[in-house]
Amino acid sequence: MAASAVTARYGTLHNTSMAVVSLGMIVVAIVHFLSNPANAPTLSLNDPRFALFLMLAMAMLYYVFQGVTRTLNREPQVVIDHDGIRLGFGRNKSFTWDDIVWVRLRRLALRPQLEIGLADQAFITANLRLSMWSFDDSLRPVRGQPTTLLVRDNGLDTKSSAMLDAVRSFRPNLVK
């Protein structure tokens, strides 16, 4: 029996909830200041409270945007099949099984994350534009392992353990 491909898309519930909660936080702050005008900051950048709430509102609007765009994006972000692993997340890079040296689960806080060790040349050629400072990116570098990337399943509809099981079904020799 041939193994079937596993795909992971952005989860609708998670990302819609993120957008709704972020928008709700902005609305609650506005309603609070409208009902308590004595506590409201003055509409001037010279008032540090206004500057703080403006920055917080911009951050929350960013998460509203992220939640809505991810909810509407139904493209697979991770595909594991007989050809290898394809990663989306705005990069759309494919790695054949020959490019992948090993795969394992790594615990990051409480959640397991899929860690993929790539061959040096495959990692360099892919130019994944990874950043340690991007908190929203589902692809992260692993400190101390230059050709390894971490696939975070936060906001995806498939858990990392299911992705590891898919790798195991196609190439059991790669699982650490």
What do these predicted ranges mean?
Residues 22-25, 48-66:
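Canonical hydrophobic alpha-helical transmembrane segment
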Residues 10, 89, 153:
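Pocket-edge structural micro-motifs
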Residues 61-104:
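Conserved beta-hairpin
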Residues 105-109:
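Short, conserved beta-turn/loop elements at beta-strand boundaries and strand-helix junctions
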Residues 1-47, 165, 169, 175-176:
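N-terminal membrane-targeting/pre-transmembrane regions
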Residues 13, 49-52, 150:
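Individual transmembrane alpha-helices with interfacial aromatic-anchor signatures
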Residues 4-8, 95, 147-151:
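Generic detection of short hydrophobic beta-strand segments and adjacent strand-loop junctions
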